[in-house]
Curated annotation (Swiss-Prot):
It comes from Porphyromonas gingivalis (strain ATCC BAA-308 / W83). One of its GO terms (cellular component) is cytoplasm. Binds 1 Mg(2+) ion per monomer. This is Selenide, water dikinase. InterPro entries: PurM-like_C_dom (IPR010918), PurM-like_C_sf (IPR036676), PurM-like_N (IPR016188), PurM-like_N_sf (IPR036921), SelD_I (IPR023061), SPS/SelD (IPR004536). It holds the Pfam family AIRS_C. The keyword ATP-binding applies. The active site is at C17. Its EC number is 2.7.9.3. One of its GO terms (biological process) is selenocysteine biosynthetic process. Keywords: ATP-binding, Kinase, Magnesium, Metal-binding, Nucleotide-binding, Selenium, Transferase. Its cofactor is Mg(2+). ATP binds at K20, T47, H48, D49, D67, D90, G138, H139, T140.
Length: 348
């Protein structure tokens, strides 16, 4: 079947997870919204986790989440794949298995061929099929800027749930995918990188976090998150606050896409990075070159999992991630200690 050649990037200024609302503003506006109270709710928005969790019985809990955004790449089919992988990632980050999805679509009734929407949905369905989940329908509204994503329901055993609050002092931090997605996509739009770097970024965004989620269960991991629009620092902030620990990150151990550090040194810094640095604020104590700090704040789309694993098993976990053939960039990037003061993110 022929695919559309329409350039989706011509419709947007900000795409992917860089289009998220400023996290500081989001926290402020949600402050006075009352939280539901029920003994069966295991995870709500108070801990800034990747999804909500509701206990059905002693053996099964439901994971519910949603994510959608404007195009992050030119090709409609690829955009569908990336958006679906990004939405499914929240379930994987909680240690679960996606079960059911609904398509969430915004698309103009005029100006863009309807075949473009068909390609987006086909791309999304490819990724959904890879996850083993089932599409149960969806909802589409008329909007001048295309947007696509999923509402996802997953399942997990209540005793195997992975949350922001599960990190313990003494554990090591493992990251499964390289950083630099935001930098690479901005550089692509400016014509600053070649096809090799661009395709590497696309490949990482299309990659499901399924293998990482399965290994989290093998290693008994209970503290993790995925790295998306708030950057590694923003999502690490959620782990540190919910677990009441200090996270120490070795910036030079963090995996990074080719050329992205040199791009940052040359001033190719997406605006979302500055927004994310404001969000972490005084929690961050950084003693590293500026390009590394900006890398850690770079907004990722469909990024990797940041896991906290017992120190004596960290190298084995990384080796298992490498053996999957899907996560060659996986690396130990730091460790957790007891929190002693306001600085809960120490970067060297």
């Amino acid at each position: 079947m022929n695919r559309s050649s329409f350039d989706l990037l011509s419709t947007v200024e900000y795409g992917g997870c860089s289009a998220k609302l400023d996290p500081a503003k989001l926290s402020e506006l949600l402050h006075d919204i009352p939280l539901p109270v029920d003994s069966r709710i295991m995870v709500d928005v108070s801990t800034h986790d990747d999804a909500g969790v509701y206990r059905l019985n002693d053996d099964t809990a439901l994971i519910v989440t949603t994510d959608f955004f404007p195009p992050v790449c030119s090709d409609p089919y690829t955009f569908g794949r990336i958006a679906a992988a990004n939405a499914l990632s929240d379930v994987y980050a909680m240690g679960g298995r996606p079960l059911l999805v609904l398509n969430l679509t915004m698309f103009p009734s005029e100006g863009i061929p309807v075949e473009v929407l068909a390609d987006i949905l086909r791309g999304g369905q490819q990724t959904i099929d890879e996850s083993g989940a089932f599409t149960m329908g969806g909802h589409t509204i008329d909007d001048p800027i295309p947007k696509y994503g999923l509402a996802v329901t997953g399942i997990v055993h209540p005793e195997h749930l992975v949350t922001n609050a599960g990190v313990r002092a003494g554990q090591c931090l493992v990251l499964t995918k390289p950083l630099g997605i935001g930098v690479a996509m901005a550089a692509h739009r400016l014509g600053l990188i070649g096809s090799e770097v661009y395709e590497a970024a696309i490949g990482q965004m299309c990659l499901l976090n399924r293998a990482g989620a399965e290994l989290m269960q093998k290693y008994g991991i209970r503290g993790a998150t995925d790295i998306t629009g708030f950057g590694l620092l923003g999502h690490a902030k959620g782990l540190a606050e919910a677990s009441d620990v200090c996270l120490h990150i070795d910036s030079r151990s963090v995996p990074v896409l080719p050329e992205c550090l040199s791009l940052l040194r040359d001033g190719c810094i997406p605006g979302a990075a500055f927004r994310n640095l404001r969000f972490v604020g005084d929690m961050l104590r950084a003693d590293c070159p500026t390009e590394y700090k900006m890398l850690l704040a770079d907004a990722q789309t469909s990024g990797g999992l940041l896991m906290a694993v017992d120190a004596d098993r960290a190298e084995d976990l990384v080796a298992d991630l490498h053996r999957t053939g899907l996560h060659p960039f996986a690396a130990i990037i730091g460790y957790a200690t007891d929190a002693e003061d306001a600085a809960k993110l120490i970067v060297t």
